[in-house]
Amino acid sequence: TALKNAVRIGAKQYLIFGAGYDSFAYRQPEWASHIQIFELDRFILLQDKQRRLKSNQIAMPGNVYYLETDFAQKQWQKKIINHPAFDAAKNSFCSLLGLVYYLTKQEFVNLLLAISAFVPKGSSVVFDYPDENFFDVVPMQPVYVRRNRQY
């Protein structure tokens, strides 16, 4: 996987932006036990996740940190930079998988610029993204198809 390769070539931190109910930290393989994992998301979601983990008696590994973050707020990155387990000198693997769909185009650009300002050269960012029409505000027009004919 991309994360495993990043760790193999030197990544020491895994930042999961918009972590939601991501479960990597709780099923992490041995090779990942030596990296710091930061789950970043809104307070309510992180709180609910912790409640669910606790009610199912799933312990939080010692290398996992929850950081309440709202990427729309100014200076959200201070929560990461100021966290005692985060080391700005160590390469990071940053996952934005599933997050871009919730951001405007400008918020996405700002997020990438902010990340590039606090992770060192050699770090990685992985993301998925919608096609160019996703950000258009124009509503979709219905198309009716009957027997392979467009009406």
Model region roles, listed by residue range:
Residues 1-19, 23-151:
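Alpha-helical subdomain
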